[in-house]
Amino acid sequence: MQYSEIMIRYGELSTKGKNRMRFINKLRNNISDVLSIYTQVKVTADRDRAHAYLNGADYTAVAESLKQVFGIQNFSPVYKVEKSVEVLKSSVQEIMRDIYKEGMTFKISSKRSDHNFELDSRELNQTLGGAVFEAIPNVQVQMKSPDINLQVEIREEAAYLSYETIRGAGGLPVGTSGKGMLMLSGGIDSPVAGYLALKRGVDIEAVHFASPPYTSPGALKKAQDLTRKLTKFGGNIQFIEVPFTEIQEEIKAKAPEAYLMTLTRRFMMRITDRIREVRNGLVIINGESLGQVASQTLESMKAINAVTNTPIIRPVVTMDKLEIIDIAQEIDTFDISIQPFEDCCTIFAPDRPKTNPKIKNAEQYEARMDVEGLVERAVAGIMITEITPQAEKDEVDDLIDNLL
């Protein structure tokens, strides 16, 4: 027998009340986008569940793609069969012969939305259970936590059988919580922060600061590759490259070394916030983890945050490095993150950065610079590229390959 569809059950959508259908429609669109590479697959959704009709597509590949979609609690591969007692009996026997191993227990769980069907749920459980005993005489029934729970659903158009439930990614459908700008450096932490924001339904755009010739084309490609890894969880992502060389040279020339990192981060925050305004984002997201480096003390965060009133989401702020690495390995970004390309935060990093910078001091040093002009020129020079989940190269890839 061949699977005909995948039955998809929702996660936290059950708590969304009057907005439930908006969340469901967004989830349906997200599922359709992720499964668009399987041209045969068709997706529908109603208030209770969604269905991915395989139409001959490879179930295993489709299931792997579904595991990445946020908003799905779990899903089950389903056999569609004729709605008759005899066909149901023979189908149940065929499935059980295929999956049963010595010593396993089972139960039949039937329900029907077609109340004109000749047997009610209790009678159907008994009839199909009897068919299983005919096929496998020594099998044992167990009503609580059996090894095999064979689920039978009688609908108007057909009968559906399933026995396996696969855990989904959970969370909320990407896009239901608004848009956020992810400050993507190229390290381990910021891609994990982006992943966790996606899981809570935030549609992210990646903002990456490049300082050529101090940062290499390889560093830019690394950030782009990390962005591509995140697309499998939320679809296409806009990659925004910000020219940052002029600003870093200005900071280096006009500020004391201890404040280089603080001022660099304040400029990054200003620029990201300006991009957010233009692109209708609601929040800024970054990979700061409390106390991990000098710019991530509470005093530093306060001094850096002072340049904006926009909410800053720090998904990994309370995690230690090993916890973050575990997630990075799970989402397949770790090996890219540890590639030996320096980002613009490390090239001018002072030997002894200030861990408790004062806002008034930062403002005093910035008064030596044309802050607004520097920010405006950086924002005017951004380059935006749409990063897709597919393996084919984007325009930025081609450009970088020519430079390397």
Swiss-Prot record:
Keyword terms: ATP-binding, Cytoplasm, Nucleotide-binding, RNA-binding, Thiamine biosynthesis, Transferase, tRNA-binding
One family name in Pfam for this protein: ThiI
Positions with a binding annotation for ATP: 183-184, 208-209, 265, 287, 296
Any single biological process term in GO: tRNA 4-thiouridine biosynthesis
Top EC class for this record: transferase
Main location: cytoplasm
E.C. no: 2.8.1.4
GO molecular function: ATP binding; CCA tRNA nucleotidyltransferase activity; tRNA binding; tRNA-uracil-4 sulfurtransferase activity
THUMP domain ranges (all copies): 60-165
The reaction(s) this protein catalyses: [ThiI sulfur-carrier protein]-S-sulfanyl-L-cysteine + a uridine in tRNA + 2 reduced [2Fe-2S]-[ferredoxin] + ATP + H(+) = [ThiI sulfur-carrier protein]-L-cysteine + a 4-thiouridine in tRNA + 2 oxidized [2Fe-2S]-[ferredoxin] + AMP + diphosphate; [ThiS sulfur-carrier protein]-C-terminal Gly-Gly-AMP + S-sulfanyl-L-cysteinyl-[cysteine desulfurase] + AH2 = [ThiS sulfur-carrier protein]-C-terminal-Gly-aminoethanethioate + L-cysteinyl-[cysteine desulfurase] + A + AMP + 2 H(+)
Location relative to the cell: Cytoplasm
Pathway: Cofactor biosynthesis; thiamine diphosphate biosynthesis
Any Gene Ontology CC annotation: cytosol
Family: Belongs to the ThiI family.
PANTHER family linked: TRNA SULFURTRANSFERASE
Physiological role: Catalyzes the ATP-dependent transfer of a sulfur to tRNA to produce 4-thiouridine in position 8 of tRNAs, which functions as a near-UV photosensor. Also catalyzes the transfer of sulfur to the sulfur carrier protein ThiS, forming ThiS-thiocarboxylate. This is a step in the synthesis of thiazole, in the thiamine biosynthesis pathway. The sulfur is donated as persulfide by IscS.
Protein name according to UniProt: Probable tRNA sulfurtransferase
